[in-house]
């Protein structure tokens, strides 16, 4: 034991130093940077809520846009900023940039996560990559089990039809009818089913 005593003490001291280093990094570097990023985002988020996509993304000359905040603050930027930047790019028709931002969205909110995946699908539709779009819509529907899933299943069905996968599309439409009949999509789903059930 005496031979290993110094080794054990050294390992314990190193572990304490590493733990303190992580704590110090979080407390005195990361958290202040995250707060600053949040403050910088405020004007851009107001523009986002007003659907001023260009201003929200790139700023107005006086305030930073979401893209610049992400570039300046990196991982300290709130997760929602990646989602918002992706939506801005999607609305502006910049589909590849939208996909890049949306792939980097790491938020924990299931509804926003599903929506970000669905928006990636919309971007793939814009790029006419219907196979990837279909994968996104199906994945989005699998993230949540509520009426929002019906919208993603409808998109999956329409996209499957675009790919000539009518039986797969019918499966998505029937899922809406059976599991989400009270959703907006559920009210009109019979016309999609009857069109393919012939």
Predicted regions and their residues:
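Short solvent-exposed coil/turn linkers within tandem alpha-helical repeat scaffolds
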Residues: 69-79, 92, 106-114, 140-149, ...
């Amino acid at each position: 034991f005496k031979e290993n005593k110094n080794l054990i003490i050294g390992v314990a001291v190193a572990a304490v130093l590493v733990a303190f280093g992580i704590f110090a990094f979080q407390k005195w570097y990361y958290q202040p940077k995250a707060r600053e990023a949040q403050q910088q985002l405020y004007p851009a988020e107001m523009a986002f809520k007003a659907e001023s996509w260009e201003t929200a993304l790139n700023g107005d000359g006086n305030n930073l846009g979401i893209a610049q905040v992400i570039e300046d603050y990196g991982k300290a930027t709130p997760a929602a900023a990646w989602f918002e930047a992706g939506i801005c790019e999607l609305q502006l028709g910049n589909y590849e940039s939208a996909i890049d931002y949306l792939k980097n969205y790491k938020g924990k909110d299931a509804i926003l996560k599903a929506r970000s995946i669905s928006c990636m699908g919309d971007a793939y539709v814009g790029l006419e990559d219907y196979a990837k779009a279909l994968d996104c819509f199906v994945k989005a529907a699998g993230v949540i089990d509520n009426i929002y899933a019906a919208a993603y299943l409808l998109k999956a069905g329409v996209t499957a039809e675009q790919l000539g996968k009518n039986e797969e599309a019918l499966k998505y439409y029937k899922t809406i009818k059976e599991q989400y009949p009270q959703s907006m999509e559920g009210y009109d789903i019979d016309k999609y089913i009857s069109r393919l059930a012939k």
